[in-house]
Curated annotation (Swiss-Prot):
Regulation: induction: Expression shows a diurnal pattern of oscillation across the 24-hour light-dark, with increased levels during the dark period (at protein level).
GO CC field: chloroplast; ribonucleoprotein complex; ribosome
Keywords assigned by UniProt, alphabetized: Chloroplast, Plastid, Ribonucleoprotein, Ribosomal protein
Family to which the UniProt record says this protein belongs: Belongs to the bacterial ribosomal protein bL12 family.
Highest taxon of the lineage: Eukaryota
Main location: plastid
Self-association and partners: Homodimer. Part of the ribosomal stalk of the 50S ribosomal subunit. Forms a multimeric L10(L12)X complex, where L10 forms an elongated spine to which 2 to 4 L12 dimers bind in a sequential fashion. Binds GTP-bound translation factors.
Compartment(s) of residence: Plastid; Plastid, Chloroplast
UniProt-recorded name of the protein: Large ribosomal subunit protein bL12c
Length: 15
């Protein structure tokens, strides 16, 4: 994933 979407991906992982 890109740095601009890392926050979104982290949120999806920490459901």
């Amino acid at each position: 994933s890109k740095v601009e979407n890392i926050v979104d991906e982290l949120k999806t992982l920490t459901l």
